Amino acid sequence: MKPNIHPTYYHDAVVRCACGNTFITGSTKKEIRVEICSKCHPFFTGQQKIVDTGGRVERFRKRFNLEEK
């Protein structure tokens, strides 16, 4: 490796989410701000929602006789 061409690597970089969650990781930046993390993302919290565009979901459920969970 060539000397003095690589960025400084911080082993204690702080990641701050808009929800207030913080955690430590390694990065070339000392502090990282994010809008969504695993604490507030719907996939990880189990609060997923189906986005219905013009009744398509209801038509699909009606066509295949499916019930909403």
Swiss-Prot record:
Binds 1 zinc ion per subunit. Keywords: Metal-binding, Ribonucleoprotein, Ribosomal protein, RNA-binding, rRNA-binding, Zinc. InterPro entries: Ribosomal_bL28/bL31-like_sf, Ribosomal_bL31, Ribosomal_bL31_A, Ribosomal_bL31_sf. GO terms for biological process: translation. GO terms for cellular component: ribonucleoprotein complex; ribosome. It comes from the Bacteria. Pfam families: Ribosomal_L31 (PF01197). Zn(2+) binds at residues 17, 19, 37, 40. One of its GO terms (molecular function) is structural constituent of ribosome. Its cofactor is Zn(2+). Binds the 23S rRNA. Part of the 50S ribosomal subunit. Belongs to the bacterial ribosomal protein bL31 family. Type A subfamily. This is Large ribosomal subunit protein bL31. It comes from Thermoanaerobacter pseudethanolicus (strain ATCC 33223 / 39E) (Clostridium thermohydrosulfuricum). The lineage of its organism: Bacteria, Bacillati, Bacillota, Clostridia, Thermoanaerobacterales. The gene is rpmE.
